[in-house]
Structure formats: C-alpha cells, structure tokens
Amino acid sequence: MPRRKQARRTTVRDIRTILRLTHEEGLSVREIAERLKIGKSSVSTYLLRSREAGLSWPLPIGADEDAKLERRLFGRAGRPPRDLSEPDWALVVRELKRKGVTLTLLWQEYRASHPDGYGFTWFCEQVAAFRQRTSVAFRNRHAAGAVMQTDYAGPTVPVIDPATGVIHPAQIFVAVLGASNLTFAHASFSQQLPDWIDGQVRALTFYGGVTKAIVCDNLKSGVAKALWFEPTLTATFAAMAEHYDTTILPTRSRKPRDKGRVEGAVLIVERWILARLRNRTFFSLAALNTAIAELLEDLNNRTMRHVGKSRRELFEEIERPALKPLPAIPFEYAEWKSAKVHPDYHVEVDKTFYSVPHRLIGCTLQVRLTHRVVEIFHDHQRVASHVRRSQRSGHVTVNDHMPKAHQRYANTTPANLIGRATQIGPNAAILVERMMRDRPHPEQGYRSAMGILSLAPRYGSQRLEAACERALTINAITYSSVASILKSGLDRERPQAEHAAPTPAHTNIRGRSYYQ
C-alpha cells in the first residue's frame, strides 16, 4: 500500500494568499486548495479564523506584517492579551557594544520588564533583522574602546608660503573610533614617521583615552615588515605603542575591508570637510587645522540618520567609559639608531660623541634621540643619558663612565695640582705652577706636574720640597731634573750661588739711556 504523501506546512504567506484569492479573484475553497497544494479543510479553517478576527481584504494597517497577522488569527480565546511591546532595537544594538553585554542579558532585562513578552529566539531574530536593515551603520561592529582606525585621505589641501608663494600640499590624517564613529582629522606636510606619530598622538589626546588596539595602514614610515601574522614595526612606532599600552594592527595591502571604518570616515571627511574648504586659501598649517577643527565639531555633533544619535553622543554614552586613561606624559617623538661603542667608550650619534660605561666597549647599543635628550640602551636597559648638543661635533663625557685611571686624569685642573703642591711646600707649588705656565697649553704640563707630586710618597714631602727649591735655583723646571736631584741626594746639600761672569765689552751694548 503506497504511503500517503505528507502535506506541506502552511505559512503566513499562504494565509495572505488565501485571503487575496478569496476576496479579489473569488475562487472557491477547492480551487484555492488545488492552486496552493494544501488541504481544503486548512483553507476553510483559515477563512473561518479571518472572519472571526474581523479581517478583510486588503488587510488593515497593523495586520499586514506576518507576526501581527499570525497573532490576530491564532490568539487563544479567553486568554488575556500578551504584552508584546517591542524593544528599542537601536538601543539594543548600542548596548551590545558595551563590554560584557550579551543578547541573553538584554533579553532577560526585556522579559523582566515585559514578563509576557517575546521569546529569546524571536528576540535574536529581530536583532539580526535590525542590523541587516541598518547594515551601513553597523557593517563592522566593534566593542566600545576596542579599536581606533587611522589612515590618510587621498586629496590634499594647498597651503601657500606667504614669503615665497610656494604651494605645499597638506596631507590629511584621519582617525575614527570603532564603536561610536567619533572622527578626528589633522593636517600635516608629510606622511613621514614624525608626522605619522604626531597624528596618532593627537588623535588619542583628542579622544581623551586609549583603545586596546590601533588599526592602521602599513605605511613604510611605521611598519618595517608588513607581514599579516607577525608585522614588524619601526622602533619609534613600537615605542609609541608601548608608551600608550596598546597594540598596533597593520592591515593587509589592497584590503580596504581590514579598516573599513576609517575608509568610511575618510570619505566623510573628504565630503563634509575638505569639500567645504575647496574655495578657501590657507597661508599656514595652523590656519588650516583651525578650519578643520571647526567643521569636525559640526560633523561629530550631527545626528546619524540610521542611529538617531550623533557621534559625540554615542562616544560619551558607550565609548569614553571603555577607553584606557592616557599616560601622564604624552609620547615624545624620538629617532632610534644603532651605534657601536668605540675604544674610547663613546658612541657616535649625529656627528657627536657621547660616552657610555667603559665596560661596554665593542658592544652595539640602541640610541634614542629626541630634540632634547640622547638616551643609550643595552639589552633594553638605559646605560647613559645626555643632553643633546645643538652643535654637531665634539665629545660629551660623564666621568663615571671612565676607568678609574682616566677619572683621576679627567679631574685634574691647574688649581687642583697647585693646591696639592702647596701642601708639600711653597717651592713645590711654584715649580708646578711654572710647569703649566711655561707650556703653550696648561694641559701639556699636567703629566709633569702629576709626576712631581707622585715623588712625595717615595721621598717624603720635606725632601721633595728641598729638591724643588734646588731645581728652581738652577732653573731646571722639569720632572726628570727633580727626580735626578732626589736620586743623587743633592736635595740634602745647600745649593751654591753661581756668580755670573761679566759681559764682555762689544759694540752692541746699549746704555741705560736706550730704555728711557
């Protein structure tokens, strides 16, 4: 015996078609059943229910949606009407952006205020349907405080140098927050690393907080190797991310959907800001940024059609509380370089030599340069810090970086040497002073003077003082002369005054009157 074919399940659309065929085309129950391939009893039941519900054709306003039509036809008699008030779907979607908020939680809160409301499955379906209807506004959904996306606009703005008349194209940096769409824009003269970093810092300052991640284009100025799984950032960009405790996520080349939020923000900035500035003339970057800031305020305060709130309102409501606080000190742009320590325990940076601890001779160190400071690192530990010289030459040395022997020599000054000689005696002080005075440069007499002082521990201060006196008497102002006097014991003998021989008479002798 052949099995009976199972009847097709009737949908609300079939019920609507039954009403239309009955009232518009005047078909009988049998004809409608044959056309729709459903049972005659089902057609009769639906027509009966429609008459009991007071429905005619065309359907009245309020009963033309599937859910409402089904409630009118199949509501149970004698049962109190259910509380089927629908939630504010825009509010539901905004709440989902908050950290920790789920569909289950929102449905539970909805049922707490509407105990006889819709079930969880229908609730989820309606949220998905609302998101689909507003796909332009919610295409790339991000949790509040999760991401800031950055990029440069394509068009530039001409800035005229008032002194030369030369036109400089200004690049427009754009940033946007993922959840609230709050937008930031700033003009600079290049897309190089200093301006790129400055744009990121200004954007975070504008938002008053830090997102968990920054999604950016893989500019060469910020990304050394644009690998999708393990991108390598430039040292300066990585230092900025570490300073703000955030993660940098470079996008793939030619993949605009990786940063779809900022792609849309760039388009809006071009239409709502740059297009309105097209007929204005700017003579400075500051004037251009002032104009951009004014239009940016209007843009962020304008109500978004699909959300019913402005970017600023959404930011204050859901995004600001989720941002991490800014560090106490803004990031200061710095260049990073590698430098090898020379045998004289200095590294060459920008044609100037800066000292490091002498134990690091031969090592390759990392150097961080700001406009004020030079910091030198070894294995991520700072080993030296110097004030940056404005002149690109010379040496900058810290005594503590020297070996002990070098420190003693570095601390030597004429006053220091004469003071130490004075403790031995007046003749020693005079001898040391003359040693440095008689040289073209005092430094040339340092070693001789230090040699004289080094004789005191061996021979004693009294003998050294006597030897210096004898050396002064015979005009032998050298270290070797004093050492020889001490070695031969001549310091114990009284020096004999030498009588100068009279000058022989000759024609070149000038009389006293010559000098009058």
Swiss-Prot record:
Location of the region described as Disordered in the Swiss-Prot/TrEMBL record: 493-516
Cross-referenced CDD domains: HTH_ARSR
UniProt keyword annotation of DNA-binding present: yes
Gene Ontology biological process terms, A to Z: DNA integration; DNA recombination; DNA-templated transcription initiation; transposition
Entry annotated with the keyword DNA-binding: yes
HTH IS408-type domain: residues covered: 15-96
Family the entry assigns: Belongs to the transposase IS21/IS408/IS1162 family.
Full protein name: Putative transposase y4bL/y4kJ/y4tB
